[in-house]
Amino acid sequence: LLHDLCHDRSLGLSEDILREKYYLNVQPGLYQVLAIKQDAEGNDSKEDTIELIWHKMEEILQREITKECYDFVTAIEGEYLYGLMNYPARNSEKIRKIVRSCFNQMLARNDYLGKTQLSLGLGSSVKEAENIKGSFVIANRSLAERLLEGNSKMLEADASNGVLYEKKLVDKFTRNLGSALQTLDVEEIRNTINVIYNETMETPGVHGWEILEMIRQCGSIFIMRLDVPDKAELQKEFDNKCDNCVTV
């Protein structure tokens, strides 16, 4: 299920689908997604280290969270660990405390983490299975708040459109970039980026997820405008760097 949430944007869910396709023991109550991200110093995290950390994190989560849930499943997606909880509405605050406790237990395990840092993003709690996808989106948005809030925290975001949307900074970047690329003026390109950066950081109430989203959009536009042969590989490398960005 969590793998499908990561890779299938058209995924539709219902209580019946959760039971019949994914074999979950769902009950009326609340659904909530959590997302945890590993950030290794120098982005040199090795696959066996990633798995070792995630297996320990899963062990802690399964031991503590399942006591208060109808069902709880986890899935590892590279440097991300996702979990989906289905629990009685009355357990909402208790679940929140347990998730925080589990996260803190893992943060204390320096023997596992070494130089790796963790961040945990909480999705919104939803009543209907069809809204689990929205909780998944919010969990990932919450993780992006580490750009402003820092690592080693349990983070939360809301479902608002944010404050950058009305500033149309991506449109401004596109216009300014066009003239800069026509003249191949490196300094003008650098200035274009700096102007957008400064306007972004000076915007009151800006969220980390908005910044990350804008960086992705501007970066993709820049790559598409470049006259280079392997744009797909360049885009993949850029996306990976965005995933591993921990500060602005």
What is the predicted function of each stretch?
Residues 168, 226-239:
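Short, well-ordered alpha-helical segments
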Residues 111, 115, 223-231:
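Charged/polar positions within long, soluble alpha-helices
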Residues 241-248:
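Short, intrinsically disordered, charge-balanced linker/junction segments flanking boundaries
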Residues 201-205, 224:
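AAA+ ATPase "lid" subdomain C-terminal helix
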Residues 1-101, 122-128, 133-147, 151-184, ...:
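Interdomain helical linkers/hinges and coiled-coil/dimerization scaffolds
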Residues 67-69, 105-113:
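Short catalytic/binding micro-motifs of nucleotide second-messenger systems
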